[in-house]
Amino acid sequence: NLVSNAKSISKYLAITSDDRAITSLPFNYSYGLSVINSHLSSGGSIVLTNSSMMERDFWHLINKHSVTSLAGVPYNYEMILRLGIDRLEIPSIKKMTQAGGKLSFDKIKKISTTLQKKNIRFYSMYGQTEATARISYLPPENINNKPGSIGKAIPNGKLWIENKDGELIDQIDSVGELIYSGENVSMGYAKSINDLELGDMNKGILRTGDLAKFDSDGYYYIEGSTNRFVKIFGNRISLDSIEEIIINKGFESAATGYDDKLLIYVIHNNNLLTDLLRSDISAEIGINQTAIQINAVSEFPRLNNGKINYNGLTNIQ
């Protein structure tokens, strides 16, 4: 599965022996490891560094060693936007990739438009650790006309959606669980030494746990996660859709909660804005404001791969 995914990534990103990546992501993160595997298996090279994108040394190394490819998660790209993406002088970079979460379309559009002027190809991607990192990609030429799409399956992979009864959904814009098949799917999880005797449990098929739909051109869109829901007064609310509502209003957000309580964390310092957001969300999802708690924070707790640490949110109420 590691070899298969490395080859597929190398193919759609056109990685050659002339390419050089930099360790912008942790090795123990599947996306970060896939960057290393795909470049080395193609005869390319890797620049090793412990510096982050917020450090001057990181960008110095990119130019010093003529790095051609840069990978990041949404948090990394939010940092790049804060630094001023239009001011970045990185002439050797030919392609930049993003996975590991969802960026708002406004941010993706700003990034892709700016990078296009610098002759840098920007790829938005989707993946799962259980599929050795990457499942689909959205080519740069489709970024602006397929807003929010995760694209199509990587080479040698296949995507489809099923309803809750496991039946194939073949109608456009109908939501179901996203299913993937390919040689890059792992065998399963070994929680004990005895599990190693079970063999290939997944048999090349991965139920992602994400809800998705596809359009008339066969491009897929994530609509939420099967386990990212809370029940508020009997209504099933998608936490991902709540985050999407606030992101589209221009604010970074993280949503969690429990039965009859929706907890939303937003990066801002305006109490009036908190009340306005609570009112807007209440109107959009049809839930009484008393069930909505909005917490203004300066930053989100994050895991070492840059993703939001949802378990840590309750510690900053």
PLM features: residue spans?
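Conserved AMP-binding/adenylation subdomain of ANL enzymes
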Residues: 3-20, 28-69, 154
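Alpha-helix capping/helix-boundary segments
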Residues: 75-77, 103, 185
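Short Gly/Pro-enriched turn/cap motifs at secondary-structure boundaries
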Residues: 148-153, 202-204
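Conserved ATP/PPi-binding loop(s) of AMP-dependent carboxylate-activating enzymes
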Residues: 152-156, 167-199, 237
